[in-house]
């Protein structure tokens, strides 16, 4: 039995979450618990422009302002911040920029490939020099047909770069510059502008199949044109680093030396010690909305990874009961690794057209694991174009929301 009722703002929540910014405070009555709910625009692009180093395309990721909000309020410099579903590494990168230690976990190895190099950005001149030294004219075998995406000369360069990076990695010679080039190339494989290696296709966070691309080419009467892979990698490298100042670069380098990247199920992170984490900021997979293998098959090919094997290990619960059971195990593990008075900010959403509000399921999962649920924050922002992230629709016409359940270990 649950419901919402107007209630006075609680002083503790005001102190922690600057509730003066909220339009209203409510109570959610859920399983005999009274949870304060705060709605408002808690962070905006104007309040804090996200650093350019975040600009890596990845399906289903929150904006950097979300982890920044909690990192700045619920942790201090030197504390460890964690994300068990790291994705493109938004929490890890933002925590590093704030001077925190970081641990990032994701069962998908592409997560570390896209995140770790951005903690140690090489100088653009060094990137250009390394690319110039790689022989991209060498013929390398490509076992799958990618002619619907790439011009033959572009594909030759991609295959040669893939072979070079794979050899460097296997031989143990891969360095920070190689890892950076791998990260940028992975991000530039396919997209909908001249900044990508491919002919026009879906945005890079929505990879399409070879069969679907053939239809796109037919519909647009297009054929793949040549793209200079070296030039595009250098260009994107400049874009990623364009607004990094000396303090931010130092913060990233400091975090890089101590950063830990895990590739495990989120409910079994045995490498993390008990009570090691001050703050977790994360957003788990939501039921069956995002199909990782379909989205990442080409990125996996470029990085010599088995997309189907990776997908088999990713939580894609098709029923709410299965999802609850999976998240219950995750919360038990989060309770183990969280220090006393540490925090978890767990971002969920309204899914299936608002028929399921996952926060109402997450609250009892967290409290059953031992956490105290301190509040639910619903960040509401106006937008001017259609938004649909994670399959999460708009809570009302003209607004988009993040729904974050905030727990504390007492």
Task: Identify what each model region corresponds to.
Residues 167-279, 287-288:
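SAM-dependent nucleic-acid methyltransferase catalytic core
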Residues 354-363, 367, 371-410:
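Class I S-adenosyl-L-methionine
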């Amino acid at each position: 039995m649950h419901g919402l009722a107007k209630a006075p703002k609680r002083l503790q929540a005001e102190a922690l979450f600057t509730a003066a910014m909220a339009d209203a405070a409510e109570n959610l009555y859920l399983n005999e618990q009274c949870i304060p709910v705060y709605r408002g625009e808690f962070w905006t692009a104007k309040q804090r422009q996200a650093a350019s180093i975040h600009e890596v395309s990845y399906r289903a990721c929150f904006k950097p302002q979300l982890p920044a909000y909690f990192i700045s309020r619920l942790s201090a410099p030197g504390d460890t911040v964690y994300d068990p579903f790291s994705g493109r590494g938004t929490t890890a990168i933002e925590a590093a920029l704030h001077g925190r230690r970081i641990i990032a976990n994701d069962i998908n190895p592409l997560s570390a490939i896209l995140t770790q190099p951005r903690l140690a950005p090489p100088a653009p001149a060094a990137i250009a020099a390394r690319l110039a030294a790689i022989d991209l004219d060498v013929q390398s075998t490509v076992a799958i047909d990618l002619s619907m995406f790439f011009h033959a000369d572009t594909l030759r360069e991609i295959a040669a770069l893939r072979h070079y990076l794979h050899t460097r990695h296997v031989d143990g010679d891969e360095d920070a510059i190689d890892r950076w080039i791998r990260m940028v190339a992975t991000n530039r494989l396919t997209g909908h502008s001249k900044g990508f290696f491919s002919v026009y296709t879906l945005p890079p966070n929505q990879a399409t199949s070879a069969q679907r691309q053939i239809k796109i080419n037919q519909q647009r009467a297009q054929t793949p044109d040549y793209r200079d892979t070296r030039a595009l990698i250098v260009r994107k490298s400049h874009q990623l680093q364009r607004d990094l100042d000396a303090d931010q670069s130092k913060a990233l380098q400091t975090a890089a030396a101590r950063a830990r990247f895990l590739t495990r199920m989120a409910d079994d992170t045995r490498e993390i010690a008990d009570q090691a984490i001050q703050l977790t900021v994360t957003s788990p997979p939501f039921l069956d909305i995002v199909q990782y293998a379909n989205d990442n098959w080409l990125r996996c090919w470029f990085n010599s990874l088995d997309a189907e094997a990776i997908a088999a290990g990713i939580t894609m619960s098709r029923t709410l009961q299965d999802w609850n059971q999976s998240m219950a195990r995750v919360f038990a593990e989060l309770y183990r690794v969280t220090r006393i008075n540490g925090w978890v900010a767990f971002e969920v959403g309204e899914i299936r057209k608002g028929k399921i509000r996952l926060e109402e399921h997450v609250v009892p999962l967290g409290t059953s694991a031992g956490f105290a649920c301190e509040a639910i924050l619903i960040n509401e922002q106006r937008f001017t174009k259609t938004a649909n992230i994670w399959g999460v629709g708009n809570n009302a016409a003209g607004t988009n929301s993040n729904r974050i359940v905030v727990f504390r270990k007492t």
